[in-house]
């Protein structure tokens, strides 16, 4: 079972990512378990779940994507990380500690 976390304060964007993965992905829907989070705080509360893939919004109220990933990597170094952003501005922390697999731009 592939555990995929989607951490974004925009519910519509979370649904969009799920839809793309379900319709275009290589795994069938019964091989995927989605976990949705509205904030970095919520994701960190579930840190005991070792997600395989994490889609992380860069800009959220409270803990932003960078701060969340810095803390999350203490629990889960192996997860594949994809940063999602409306603007492309990676920081040294997000690159070095987060070690993202990809940055993807949100539709504006």
What name fits each language-model region?
Residues 8, 57:
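Active-site residues of response regulator receiver
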Residues 10-35:
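Two-component/phosphorelay signaling modules centered on CheY-like receiver
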Residues 33-53:
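Acidic, metal-coordinating helix/loop segments flanking the phosphotransfer/catalytic sites
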Residues 39, 64-67:
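Acidic catalytic/metal-coordinating carboxylates
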Residues 47-50, 72-78, 98:
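Conserved phosphotransfer cores of two-component systems
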Residues 54, 78-89:
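A short, hydrophobic beta-strand element within the central beta-sheet of small alpha/beta folds
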Residues 61:
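The feature encodes the CheY-like receiver
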Residues 67, 88-104:
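Alpha4 helix (beta4-alpha4-beta5 surface) of REC/receiver domains from two-component response regulators
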């Amino acid at each position: 079972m592939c555990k995929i976390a989607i951490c974004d304060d925009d519910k519509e964007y979370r649904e969009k990512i799920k839809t793309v993965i379900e319709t275009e992905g290589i795994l069938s829907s019964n091989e995927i378990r989605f976990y949705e989070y509205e904030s970095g705080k919520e994701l960190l509360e579930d840190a005991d779940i070792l997600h395989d893939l994490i889609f992380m919004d860069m800009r959220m109220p409270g803990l932003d994507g960078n701060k969340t990933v810095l803390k999350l990597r203490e629990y889960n170094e192996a997860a594949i990380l994809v940063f999602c952003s409306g603007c492309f501005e990676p920081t040294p922390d997000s690159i070095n500690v987060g070690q993202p697999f990809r940055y993807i731009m949100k539709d504006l």
